[in-house]
Amino acid sequence: MEGKTTMKGLAMLGIGRIGWIEKKIPECGPLDALVRPLALAPCTSDTHTVWAGAIGDRHDMILGHEAVGQIVKVGSLVKRLKVGDKVIVPAITPDWGEEESQRGYPMHSGGMLGGWKFSNFKDGVFSEVFHVNEADANLALLPRDIKPEDAVMLSDMVTTGFHGAELANIKLGDTVCVIGIGPVGLMSVAGANHLGAGRIFAVGSRKHCCDIALEYGATDIINYKNGDIVEQILKATDGKGVDKVVIAGGDVHTFAQAVKMIKPGSDIGNVNYLGEGDNIDIPRSEWGVGMGHKHIHGGLTPGGRVRMEKLASLISTGKLDTSKLITHRFEGLEKVEDALMLMKNKPADLIKPVVRIHYDDEDTLH
């Protein structure tokens, strides 16, 4: 980066259009850091943003929010980090002094979804260099025993999937249904398992995802191609339904299925990015005409350093293997476009693509 003033990145040019652009390298504030990518992963939400226009039109905004990187510059007030450090970059990078952060909702710092900065209202990570606010609070050092490509799954997939299990308030022995077993849903299965769920139903149809769901702790597979998933769940539970539901896929109509399959006094946790539709369906009768104590919780995953450190410890201790999520591997920043198009086109064997970027001075930068 020495002497350079511009960087290239893969950007959303407008709704339905992407391309490579050149931009000025961001300024590094006193609390901030500039980072170069070591591993990147495109997300389904990137495709919602570009091709569905889910958050409105964006022009020349660099995409991407899942990264592991290496610090190339730190601000004068940064204490914990230095140039050359390899770091896990959470998709959610809150401003920790905001009122929402002080109230316990840092993911909404500055306003609803305000902690989600990358590829929302700030250039993302699919570039030669990217900016991270409040580096000490938001960047976690990459443990030496974790590969960058495995750690990049922590940025969003693991934390979001586990948050679905947290939102569903899963307790020991609960019967749980996870709707949607893409990478986030697979991590919701793993999260439910870690929180002590008993029977775990995983709803999906692609064989590879179903096989991996079983490896992460699912006990039953519900294939929506075999009939109504509510009827299948009720039949499998002798008409009782489930204690908790995690929604990690589907659309605005999926909430109706969740409400129909849970018991009174139960919880639904949603971490699915609803890219389309103005309203969600909640069936009046099955919701107990509004009084069924069937609770719906939807939440953006928490961000920040400490959460990344705790999730990384699950990999370091052998309790979570994120490499099972990675089905396609690329080398070089320019390949992030191919990886993004894979997420858009969703071939049957896809779970998650990862792009690894190498540098000659990766182990000597300081």
Swiss-Prot record:
NADP(+) binds at residues 181-184, 204-206, 224, 271-273, 346. This is NADP-dependent isopropanol dehydrogenase. Binds 1 zinc ion per subunit. Pfam families: ADH_N (PF08240), ADH_zinc_N (PF00107). Keywords: Cytoplasm, Metal-binding, NADP, Oxidoreductase, Zinc. GO terms for molecular function: isopropanol dehydrogenase (NADP+) activity; zinc ion binding. Homodimer. It comes from the Eukaryota. Zn(2+) binds at residues 43, 65-66, 156. The keyword Cytoplasm applies. It comes from Entamoeba histolytica (strain ATCC 30459 / HM-1:IMSS / ABRM). Its cofactor is Zn(2+).
